[in-house]
UniProtKB/Swiss-Prot annotation:
Gene Ontology cellular-component annotations: plasma membrane
Protein name per its UniProtKB record: UPF0761 membrane protein Ping_3482
InterPro entries the record matches: UPF0761_bac, Virul_fac_BrkB
Family stated for the protein in its record: Belongs to the UPF0761 family.
Topological category with respect to the lipid bilayer: Multi-pass membrane protein
Membrane-spanning segments: 43-63, 100-120, 139-159, 179-199, 209-229, 243-263
The species this protein was found in: Psychromonas ingrahamii (strain DSM 17664 / CCUG 51855 / 37)
């Protein structure tokens, strides 16, 4: 009984030490500053990025029926309480981009690539990566993300629709609905894990990326509910800013979202380092015990 209690207390102690380790590392990296930078760049590039995504999907007729579903997914997660308002404004902006010249479209792509580049630099700063990719290699990777990302999103939505139809045909609609209700969380989790695995310029254990991605996904969806509750019960922003309230609210939400992404990155980056330190400490204790 005492042995089992000791194991539990040791695990609690290690967990506390790790949380303290992550906190200190986050303070050292001052992640609030890059989160604000990413939020600002996101506001600048959100219309170009969505325009590029929808252009890419339009190139594949198989995804044409999924455009509405994708829009709902993006706008509902973009701001939990004002999805319809944001969708109306951004859709109008995207429609305006169709009137642009080739030079204008090129500038849209450049702004979208700027966001991806900023994400890449911020994540690698957390990992303390010293080796850098060449400009050509970086551009190739950014362009691949920009071109294949919408296709992967479209394929995921198509798979969700297919699974729903299969469950419906076999009379397992309630199970299918429960499964599909988890799809946004699962996709968010895997997206975070994919970012933490692929973006750093070094090898990252996918197991640690899954842990960091899970924590980020939980915080993201918890924050979504909390944010919705706050906006619904304390509508001070709407009273002060009126119709313009969506702008500061959108910025705060994007800032929070990037803060969560960076917290998940800190968790993933520090897991291996912390466990290595614990292992070294245990080896040292065993050595000292044997020496005594």
């Amino acid at each position: 009984m005492k042995f089992g209690r000791k194991i539990v207390m040791d695990k609690v102690k290690v967990t506390y030490q790790y949380l303290l380790f992550v906190w200190r590392r986050s303070e050292q990296d001052n992640i609030k500053v890059p989160a604000g930078h990413l939020a600002y760049v996101t506001l600048l590039s959100i219309v170009p990025l969505l325009a590029v995504i929808f252009y890419m999907l339009a190139a594949f007729p198989v995804f044409s029926d999924l455009k509405g579903m994708l829009e709902d997914l993006i706008y509902n997660n973009l701001l939990p309480t004002s999805g319809d308002t944001i969708q109306e404004h951004i859709s109008g902006f995207i429609e305006n981009t169709k009137k642009m010249s080739m030079m204008g479209i090129g500038s849209l792509i450049a702004i979208a690539l700027l966001l991806i580049s900023t994400i890449d630099q911020t994540i690698n700063r957390i990992w303390r990566c010293t080796n850098k990719r060449s400009r050509i290699q970086s551009f190739t990777i950014y362009w691949t993300i920009l071109s294949l990302g919408p296709v992967i999103i479209g394929a995921s939505l198509a798979l969700s629709s297919y699974l729903f139809s299969v469950f419906q045909e076999h009379g397992s609609l309630s199970f299918g609905q429960r499964l599909l209700s988890l799809m946004p969380f699962i996709l968010t989790w895997l997206t975070f894990a994919g970012v933490y695995t692929l973006v750093p310029h070094q090898r990252v254990s996918f197991r640690y990326a899954l842990i960091g991605g899970l924590i980020a996904a939980i915080l993201f969806f918890f924050g979504t509910d909390l944010f919705r509750l706050y906006i619904t019960n304390f509508p001070s922003q709407q009273i002060i800013y009126g119709a313009l309230a969506v702008i500061p609210i959108l910025f705060v939400w994007i800032y929070y979202s990037w803060l969560i992404v960076l917290i998940g990155a800190e968790v993933t980056a520090t897991l291996e380092e912390f466990l290595k330190q614990q292992e070294d400490n245990n080896v040292t204790k065993e050595y000292l015990g044997a020496d005594i």
